[in-house]
Swiss-Prot record:
PANTHER family: TRNA N6-ADENOSINE THREONYLCARBAMOYLTRANSFERASE (PTHR11735), TRNA N6-ADENOSINE THREONYLCARBAMOYLTRANSFERASE, MITOCHONDRIAL (PTHR11735:SF6). GO terms for molecular function: iron ion binding; N(6)-L-threonylcarbamoyladenine synthase activity. It catalyses: L-threonylcarbamoyladenylate + adenosine(37) in tRNA = N(6)-L-threonylcarbamoyladenosine(37) in tRNA + AMP + H(+). Substrate binds at residues 136-140, 170, 183, 187, 282. It comes from Bifidobacterium longum (strain NCC 2705). The gene is tsaD. Fe cation binds at residues 113, 117, 310. Gene3D superfamilies: 3.30.420.40. One of its GO terms (cellular component) is cytoplasm. This is tRNA N6-adenosine threonylcarbamoyltransferase. Its EC number is 2.3.1.234.
């Protein structure tokens, strides 16, 4: 069988994206973001995002085909993010993808957007080893997964009990007065600060709580501790050392993620850790994971920055996995699922 060619379409939040992947080769990757339209509101406004998807859908898909020097007839299947995400945004992408699939008589796969974040690493590092661990870190998800057989069997090893890592960063960013999105600002300032200047707690790593939740995450306490420290310094009339706050926060969160990921690798006898999600673009986290991986003898696979944030390549790559595994396409009338569980790879 020749390598499958899949058109991937993404519209879960504020990026409209389309890409074409053949096997493990990325042929095109087009992204249109409405982020600037949301910045004035301090977060994504679903109605604005949905309208932006409707406007960008056809141009993105058309450019992806042109860039790959293909027509829709050359594509073997279409994959589209069916969840999790904002319902209105998902509806635009899924409706458009269904129309294309019907018009071109192509099979369609409604895929799990979050699993796509780890699938995309194959474009850079090749196929998944069997029985590997995966760390997903994004604005809405922080989870450790056991990927026994991609894409057929994926289990959740640990997950966040409250705020995800990205949410923690966004909330602290607002506290420090950074514009939306705040994560990149914390990353940039953190590179110039002292990571040990401020004592930031490491949730669920010690005592009974740590023993009871060896692979779970909790970052709400981190956010609260940083907020209280900043407020106390402001009350005392002290200037806030923004770079140090950012560096200390990033170091704490990155250390927790790296420790628990390595513990999971040891427990499941895996010498490979797959990392994905928008938060994996954070420079401190990338450095910490690579450092821990070297110390533990674990091959840490983190995709290049442009493949960390939402894109069509990750959707197309997961679509390729499903086609190769012989998984049946989704029904033509499959629904969106804004709360799609991580154990469900496709609809």
């Amino acid at each position: 069988m020749s390598e499958p060619v899949v058109l991937g379409i993404e519209s879960t939040c504020d990026e409209t994206a389309a890409a074409i992947v053949r096997g493990r080769e990325l042929l095109s990757n087009v992204v249109a973001s409405s982020m600037e339209e949301h910045a004035r509101y301090g977060g994504v406004i679903p109605e604005i995002a949905s309208r932006a998807h409707a406007e960008a859908f056809v141009p993105c898909v058309s450019k992806a085909l042109v860039d790959a020097n293909m027509t829709l007839a050359d594509v073997d299947a279409i994959a589209v993010s069916a969840g999790p995400g904002l319902a209105g945004c998902l509806a635009v992408g899924v409706s458009g993808a269904k129309a294309l699939a019907w018009a071109a008589n192509k099979p369609i796969y409604g895929i799990n957007h979050v699993i796509g974040h780890i699938a995309v690493t194959q474009l850079q590092f090749g196929p998944f080893p069997k029985d590997t661990l995966a760390l997903i870190v994004s604005g809405g998800h922080t989870s450790l997964l056991h990927v026994e057989d991609m894409p057929r069997k994926i289990d959740v090893v640990g997950t966040t009990l409250d705020d995800a890592a990205g949410e923690c960063f966004d909330k602290v960013a607002r506290l420090l007065g950074f514009p939306y999105p705040g994560g990149p600002h914390i990353d940039r300032h953190g590179q110039n600060g002292d990571p040990h200047a401020i004592k930031v707690p490491m949730g669920l790593t010690q005592g009974k709580a740590g023993a009871a939740h060896p692979y779970d995450f909790s970052f709400s306490g981190v956010k609260t501790a940083v907020a209280r420290w900043v407020e106390s310094e402001q009350a005392a009339g002290h200037e806030i050392p923004v770079d140090d706050v950012c560096a200390s926060l990033a170091d704490s969160v990155a250390t927790v993620l790296a420790r628990k990921a390595m513990r999971g690798c040891r427990q499941y006898d895996s010498n490979t850790l797959i990392v994905g999600g928008g938060f994996s673009a954070n420079s401190q986290l990338r450095a910490k994971l690579l450092e821990f991986g070297e110390n533990y003898g674990v091959d840490v696979r983190i995709p290049q920055i442009k493949l960390c944030t939402d894109n069509g390549a990750m959707v197309a790559m997961l679509g390729v996995n499903l086609v190769e595994a012989g998984v049946a396409p989704s029904a033509p009338d499959f629904p969106i699922d804004s709360a799609m569980p991580l154990t469900k790879v496709s609809m």
